[in-house]
Amino acid sequence: MTQILVKNAFSWVNIAEDVCKFIPNCKLTVIDKEAIPSVEDTNVIYIGDLMNVKTISMLERIKAKNVVLWVDETRVPKTSYSLKNLKYNYWIVPVSQWNKEVYEEHIGHTEEIIPRCTEFRRTEGKRRGNVLFGVVSFTPGVYKRYEELLLAVDYYRKNYGELEIYAYGHTEGLPSFPGVHNMGRLGKSEIQKLYSIADFAIELGIEAFGMPSIEAWAMQVPMLYGNVNDVRNHAYGVSIDPVDFDAIDFGEYILPVPIYDEYKLAEKIREVAEIEEVPELPEKYRCSYTAKKLISYLEA
């Protein structure tokens, strides 16, 4: 049996569920931050972040023969950690080039990059109605863009035509605005339904390490995305520079945010919405492919 351990984070649990479907005799265990899971299986795949004392302590205490660590970091770690006490064979598999560089700086050798994955697939033709529909995934990093986005939506309506926005994710506390629908936190199937009616998607996060760009591409929806970190490598659509990335002080997590001009942002929305054809998602972003790659380490 292969046991998958996954941190209790919404996007990673969704991914782990899809990966487990393609691994024979697979058992999925969702773990809390403080938990030391019971592991009796020979092979373990751990999914989540790694640069954390509690996480590494947990990994050191489980009993297994072979462990694959499919991991990411959303911030540069402040402290170096070591996995030297692990008593089993392990492979560190980063999800992106940025993650690979971070782990190799702090831990050492890593394996080839295996990006995040999805099994979303478009089953309906792209909609083209009189009203343009956009989907926005909200994370804390996007809050800084909310007012600018609303101004751009208002500008678009006055100059180009009707536009409706559906926002999901961390939308708690966001002010109401005509034609902007805050959907809150949605399940996997509900997110897929949103993308099935969307003409375009927006991801303007400063950190931008999440799943929306891959999910939108899988649903063949073009995206307006922030040109930062690794999102530029797995998004299809139109990019916009959201921040002077060299000016970010990660030590204090200071994120200087220049102001978007509503005209510029509205023009970018218009540009991405005019993309009619989006190619199918490359195989390397499919969880069926990911499962084969991860299990290959355990079978070597």
Swiss-Prot record:
EC numbers: 2.4.-.-
Family (UniProt): Belongs to the glycosyltransferase group 1 family. Glycosyltransferase 4 subfamily.
UniProt entry tagged with the keyword Transferase: yes
Transferase keyword on record: yes
Keywords linked to the UniProt accession: Glycosyltransferase, Transferase
MF terms (GO), sorted A to Z: glycosyltransferase activity
Signal peptide (UniProt feature, chain positions): none
EC class of the enzyme, as a word: transferase
Protein name: Putative glycosyltransferase ORF300
